[in-house]
Amino acid sequence: MENSKSFGPRLKAAAGYAWREGTVYFVLAFLVIMFTVINPRFFSSRNIYNLITESSHYIIAGMGISFVMIGGGIDLSVGYEMAMVSTTSFLLMSSYASSHGGQVPTWFILVIFVWGIFLGFMMGMLNGVICAKLKLFPLIVTIATSEVFKGLCYTITSSKTYSGLPANFRALYTTKLLGLPLDVYLALLCVILTWFVLNKTHFGRDVLAVGGNRECARLSGIKADWVQILTFAITGAVFGLAALDMMAHQNMTSATSGPGSEFVCLTAAIIGGISMMGGKGNVVGLVAGIFVMQIISNGMQLAGWGAYLQYAVKGIILLAAISFDALKNRPRPVVRVHNDAPGSGGEPKKEAA
């Protein structure tokens, strides 16, 4: 009898968990079925290959944004951070090639990767220091620094588009292993490392604690400012790596290479279960969210829907994702008994938990 009574609440709890954490997978399955019905070419092996390869740099970038969001922040400057990394990296390679007979050795390509990650790290750290030490809102700070990076990009490039990357740089995309480009495996490695850091390390627990309640984390001995600074710095570094991967894919770069990626990653993160309030997140769900965004773009193109309509659809998805996140994280009423006097048997009252 007791087991039958407890079955109902357990079933309700399981349904609630599936609703909160499994929505992204239901949406993913629905989109695959819908676009396959609209155009059977959607589920072809060639198109699936394109979806996987075109998602790799977004997955890498998504792992970056997971740190800052789970830590309770947001970074809207990462798009132009990517542009800064890609344009300066191209100009460095071009300068080296022009002074060395047009050749760029592999060791210099490795230097470029170190440079891109380092530059992203420093730009992210700048955001983190301003937010943590001046106690400013990350949203406002990163909008401002985004404009700074944007101005620097256009100044450095003179609004030009650069193309023709060295073959050994593009090897990250052109070299295949088991039929897939190397950067797909790089994206998988980033997912594994991010999951491990956030779930199995002391730093990851600190990030979750600061994102969940910064003041409680500080009172428990966690250096909340440094955790916030490091989450921004790690986000910048990972976006720097994503910028280099994107450049290898596109075989070109400009001041517009990167902006817009922050929108895709932010939406995918929220869809995938990373709360805008911080303190919780699921990197596997984030990957599913990336595929949701890519499937929408790819499916709409195959369906012959206008490119401009995609912006409207993606905007609606972001608004819906934010609303759903707010709904999931709103305070839930609980019943507490207040006794006004000993033995008076106070009336139960509802309060927000």
Regions found by a protein language model. Name each.
Residues 98-145, 288:
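Alpha-helical transmembrane segments within multi-pass membrane transporters and channels
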